[in-house]
Amino acid sequence: MKVINARNVNDALLLGLDLFQDPRNFREQESRNGTTYEALEPVTTVYNKPWERVMLVKLRDANPFFHFIEGLWMLAGRNDLKPLTYLLKSMEDFSDDGETLWGAYGYRWKSYFHKDQIKLVIEMLKANPDDRRCVLQMWDANKDLNRRGKDVPCNTTIYFKIRDKKLNMTVCNRSNDMLWGAYGANAVHMSMLQEYIASHLRVQIGTYRQVSDSFHVYHNELWERVKGLEIDPWTYSDIKNPYDLLEGTVYTNF
């Protein structure tokens, strides 16, 4: 198990790229979507400030507005495609019927299993802040296992617990594209979920851990663009901790 201990998603990106600089850490692996470089063992990313969720590395060229809207769409428990394709038409590529997303996380959080799992987690932790049974499920073995659709959930399970009056969250992921998934959409969506639940519990946001079983990057234009970034505290200090440069920004942690 490799552990990437990061301040935020920007920090994690540079540390993740550093992992793929050493050929002893990865192998070339074919996939249904093309050739990847895959870490030889699972990777856990630890975010110590998960609320610093916006990717500010210019070469990554992430769209924080779309990620934020998609995060709200998830918290609303929706699976309809139209609100997303209005902003990003290519989301249609992940739909089997052109109208919905099969693996929509928010829908699975709030409706798919015939219960609002988010509400239950909040109620459980309000009743017992020491509870260790707060498991939010996204993977349905009855329908997802051996399914050949376009959108099978990559994130499978989320665990919540309160320690030292902070809400910690661990997300388990079967397959994680480092650039588009782990340090793109996942860092935004899951930290928004953590913040939402913490706000209802009136506790601080703790650590967010993302456990990625298959941690990989695809051989594509984005990889070619960012792979040369290196961890250099003098050259890339403005990239590694960009939030230090946001003068006057105040974050209120409950």
Positions of PLM-derived features:
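Terminal, non-catalytic protein-protein interaction segments that mediate quaternary/complex assembly
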Residues: 1-254
